[in-house]
């Protein structure tokens, strides 16, 4: 049976409503609220890590080390950077850009670029996003701008969208992708 790890920053009740599997175990461990569910097809371990990239990276490593998860999913609320995405209910992230990662003063690389990647975009697992879109065609593929800053200012949303071609923004994805 596959084990799915899920990182949730805030709204744990939304996950429970969406996935509605049978709760097997609920516990507090290593500073995390951990919920374990099972269906006939998979086991799901949900960690409520709190908001932010460092919290998400830590929660992701916890899932990998302690539960040996096969995949990690990020479930949460995002902000739309375009009018269309402000109205969209569900999406699937195909690429992530860490918009507030900036070493350009030291190494002259572009903002968001990690040297081990060919460009500013951190890839997600293509086979997973393709499979998810086959099962749920309503999922809109997006580029996610991730950073440790809640973006509420409309002008800043426009800047992030224009600078990185991002459709949504949130605070956990870069930490999760870099950890996996």
Where are these predicted regions, by residue range?
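Proline-aspartate-enriched helix->loop->beta-strand connector
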Residues: 68-73, 166, 180
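Short glycine-rich, acidic/polar surface loops and turns
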Residues: 170-180
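Catalytic beta-strand/loop module used to bind and position nucleotide/cofactor moieties
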Residues: 164-170
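Mid-sequence, gly/pro-rich, charge-dense loop/helix-turn segments that line enzyme active sites
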Residues: 81-164
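Phosphate/ribose-phosphate-bearing ligand recognition and processing surfaces
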Residues: 1, 82, 86, 179
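N-terminal short beta-loop-beta anion/metal-coordinating cradle
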Residues: 1-61, 66-67
């Amino acid at each position: 049976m596959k084990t799915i790890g899920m990182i949730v920053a805030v709204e744990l009740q939304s996950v429970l409503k969406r996935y509605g599997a049978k709760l097997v175990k609920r516990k507090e461990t290593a500073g995390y609220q951990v919920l374990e569910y099972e269906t006939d097809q998979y086991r799901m371990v949900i960690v409520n890590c709190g908001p932010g990239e460092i919290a998400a990276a830590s929660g992701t490593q916890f899932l990998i080390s302690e539960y040996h998860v096969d995949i990690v999913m990020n479930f949460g609320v995002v902000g739309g950077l375009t009018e269309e995405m402000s109205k969209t209910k569900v999406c699937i992230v195909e690429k992530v850009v860490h918009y507030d990662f900036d070493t350009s003063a030291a190494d002259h690389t572009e903002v968001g670029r990690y040297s081990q990647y060919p460009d500013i975009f951190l890839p997600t697992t293509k086979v997973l996003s393709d499979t998810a879109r086959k099962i749920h065609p309503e999922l809109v593929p997006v580029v996610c701008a991730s950073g440790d800053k809640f973006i509420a200012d409309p002008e800043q949303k426009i800047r992030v969208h224009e600078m990185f071609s991002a459709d949504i923004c949130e605070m956990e994805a870069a930490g999760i992708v870099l950890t996996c």
